[in-house]
Amino acid sequence: EALQSIAGYTCYNDVSIRDYQRHTSQFVPGKNFSKTGGCGPFLKLASSINNYQSLTIKTILNGEVMQEAKLDQLIFTIPEIISYISSFTPLVAGDIIVTGTPGGVGDRRDPPLYMKTGDIVEVEISEVGKLVNPVLDENIIL
C-alpha cells in the first residue's frame, strides 16, 4: 500500500552542517538550515520505475565517486519508512521523504573529508537523474 502512495522519485542533496549537527545526539540541527538541501532537477514518476530497489544512488565530489549503493541496501525499505513516518505525522500529497545516504560520508573518512567553497557535488540516481550543486561560502548565499 505504501508504494502506491509514491508519486515519484527525485534526487536530494542531503547536506549536513556538522558543527550544528553535533549540538545533540540527533541529526536534526545539522539537517535543517535554510538553503542547504538541493532537490531535483525533476520528479521521475513512480509508474515509470519498474523496481525502485534496483536503482543506484551515487554522491560525486569534484568528479570522484564518494558514495554508491543500490536502494535495496537501505537499512529500512521505502514502504517501512513511509509506514513509520505516517505513524506519527500525517503525510499529504507533495510531502518529500529523504531516505538518507549510503556509506562513505566524508565526516567518517580517515582522514575526514569536508566540502569547501568551490567544490561541486553531484547526487545521481540511475533512471532518475542527476542533481549538481556548487558549494558556496555561507556569507554569499542569497
Language-model segments: what does each one mean?
Residues 1-9:
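N-terminal accessory regions of nucleic-acid-interacting proteins
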